[in-house]
UniProtKB/Swiss-Prot annotation:
This is Glycerol-3-phosphate acyltransferase. It is found in: Cell membrane. Pathway: Lipid metabolism; phospholipid metabolism. The chain crosses the membrane at residues 9-29, 54-74, 81-101, 112-132, 140-160, 165-185. Catalyzes the transfer of an acyl group from acyl-phosphate (acyl-PO(4)) to glycerol-3-phosphate (G3P) to form lysophosphatidic acid (LPA). This enzyme utilizes acyl-phosphate as fatty acyl donor, but not acyl-CoA or acyl-ACP. Its EC number is 2.3.1.275. SMART domains: G3P_acyltransf. It comes from Desulforamulus reducens (strain ATCC BAA-1160 / DSM 100696 / MI-1) (Desulfotomaculum reducens). InterPro entries: G3P_acylTferase_PlsY. It catalyses: an acyl phosphate + sn-glycerol 3-phosphate = a 1-acyl-sn-glycero-3-phosphate + phosphate.
Length: 200
């Protein structure tokens, strides 16, 4: 039976995930609606592309903190797989479908990475290395995000992680690929934005 505490912290995690740091920072930093710039996404990559490295890094860190804080809170209050994984999914759902922006948000990568870091650091570190290698070689952040996400359940399996965490990582990878469907289309067409490419 699911405890009322579990339900409450899952709702709380969704609300934490819904905080649109990219949107807020762009508005207060430069008075713009980040949804009308670049890719239209509120995540760190689009903020970086539109406003520069410093704002992009700030959003990246804040979005990761959403995932980390929600999962750590769940572990403190209700340390069961149902509660912890429910909270991890909820904080990512909040980031992707934020209540405050009419359910149009980011692509879960930063917030998801924060949640997984709090769940199981080593698979996340290995997935990050896949992301980093891909980005350095190709200069495509989106491709790195896709391959890093896809590699996550592989690392979970190879490192014999909790079965529930493995299932969770498969869901995260599938969701990340789906959220990047437009990026995949641009990658195929050769029109995806590269690091170092001048804004047009």
């Amino acid at each position: 039976m699911v405890h009322i505490t579990t339900v409450m912290i899952i709702i709380g995690a969704y609300l934490i995930g819904s905080i649109p740091f990219g949107f807020l920072l762009a508005y207060f930093w430069k008075g713009i609606d980040i949804r009308k710039c670049g890719s239209g996404n509120i995540g760190a990559t689009n903020v970086w592309r539109t406003l520069g490295k410093v704002p992009g890094m700030i959003v990246l860190i804040l979005d990761m903190i959403k995932g980390i804080s929600a999962v750590l809170l769940a572990k403190q209050l209700e340390n069961t797989d149902i509660a912890v994984l429910g909270v991890a999914l909820a904080v990512m759902a909040g980031h992707s479908w934020p209540l405050w922006l009419r359910f149009k948000g980011g692509k879960i990568i930063a917030t998801g990475a924060g949640a997984i870091l709090a769940l199981s650091p080593m698979p996340l570190l290995l997935a990050f290395l896949v992301w980093l290698t891909t980005v350095v070689v190709s200069r495509y952040v989106s491709l790195g995000s896709i391959l890093g996400a896809v590699s996550l359940p592989i690392w979970m399996a190879l490192l014999n992680q909790n079965r529930h965490y493995l299932i969770f990582s498969v869901l995260v990878a599938s969701f990340a690929v789906w959220k990047h469907s437009s990026n995949i289309g641009r990658l195929i067409k050769g029109t995806e934005f590269k690091i170092g490419q001048k804004k047009t």
